[in-house]
């Protein structure tokens, strides 16, 4: 039964049938690596046990998260539907697509947000850009546009554009937001799931982080309206406030306070009241 199903599975996972261009080879390699990573984790759990592997991943979670972001930036992996431009221009929209399909309904991302971000490279990431409209436009007010300004301290996911350029900046923008959202949610659930013995329920935190990061609502609005940034700001500020209250060293408390202020600025500068009001009320109740 497995052997009979293999051709269909192979075609769906690797899409070997249409391999005709040289571009498909690196795409297949990236696809193979994406499949290999979870298989390595499963294999390690079988060989060494689920609990030791889980504890190792918990201890090195920030290093693992940074490694995932670095790999995505190096390989130019993002969730953008910018491939739709190939479709509009009469080309194959699946070119260089590792997985999935460019979504036509995500026009806010590939027609507005991403082109605005890319255009900043041609203006030196200036505060005003005259490439749109009949007069220079205020680009800082645009959520997705990176600007060389001090206020970008509160928009850390834009730093990839300034440091790495448009293509890898886009990869950083997508991957960093997802990884940081997962880690922030994980830390939040660790914080609220402590029992009286101060035992952290890592399994509960992991499931909670998965449910938040992969929630349909989050994924639907992932590319626009800064919902991930708002959630990250809330989760990180709650965790830092909890640690601020429990730490007596002044240097640590100052660092926690600084991070909370950055989160407050990040939340305020998302500039989307429809989400800010409801999430702000939720934060007050928490």
Language model regions located:
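Conserved small/polar residues in nucleotide/adenosyl-binding loops
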Residues: 285-286
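Specific aromatic-rich, kink-prone transmembrane helix
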Residues: 231-246
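Alpha-helical transmembrane segments of polytopic membrane proteins
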Residues: 26-38, 174-176, 226-233, 279
């Amino acid at each position: 039964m497995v052997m009979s199903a293999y051709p269909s599975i192979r075609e769906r996972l690797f899409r070997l049938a249409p391999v005709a261009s040289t571009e498909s080879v690196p795409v297949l390699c990236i696809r193979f690596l994406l499949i290999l990573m979870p298989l390595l984790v499963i294999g390690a759990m079988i060989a060494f046990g689920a609990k030791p592997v889980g504890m190792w991943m918990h201890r090195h979670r920030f290093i693992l998260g940074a490694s995932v972001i670095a790999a995505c930036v190096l390989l130019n992996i993002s969730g953008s539907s910018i491939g739709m431009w190939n479709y509009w221009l009469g080309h194959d929209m699946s070119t260089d697509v590792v997985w999935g399909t460019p979504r036509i309904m995500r026009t806010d991302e590939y027609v507005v947000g991403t082109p605005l971000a890319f255009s900043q490279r041609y203006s030196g990431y200036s505060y005003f850009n005259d490439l749109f409209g009949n007069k220079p436009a205020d680009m800082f007010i645009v959520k997705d546009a990176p600007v060389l300004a001090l206020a970008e301290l509160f928009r850390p996911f834009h730093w990839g554009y300034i440091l790495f350029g448009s293509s890898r900046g886009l990869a950083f923008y997508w991957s960093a937001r997802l990884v940081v959202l997962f880690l922030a949610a994980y830390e939040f659930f660790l914080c609220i799931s402590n029992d009286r013995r101060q035992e952290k329920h890592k399994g509960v935190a992991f499931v909670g982080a998965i449910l938040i990061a992969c929630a349909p609502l989050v994924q639907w609005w992932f590319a626009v309206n800064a919902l991930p940034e708002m959630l990250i700001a809330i989760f990180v500020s709650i965790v830092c406030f909890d640690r601020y209250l429990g730490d007596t060293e002044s240097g640590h408390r100052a660092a926690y306070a600084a991070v909370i202020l950055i989160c407050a600025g990040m939340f305020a500068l998302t500039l989307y009241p429809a989400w800010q009001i409801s999430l702000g009320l939720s934060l007050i109740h928490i």
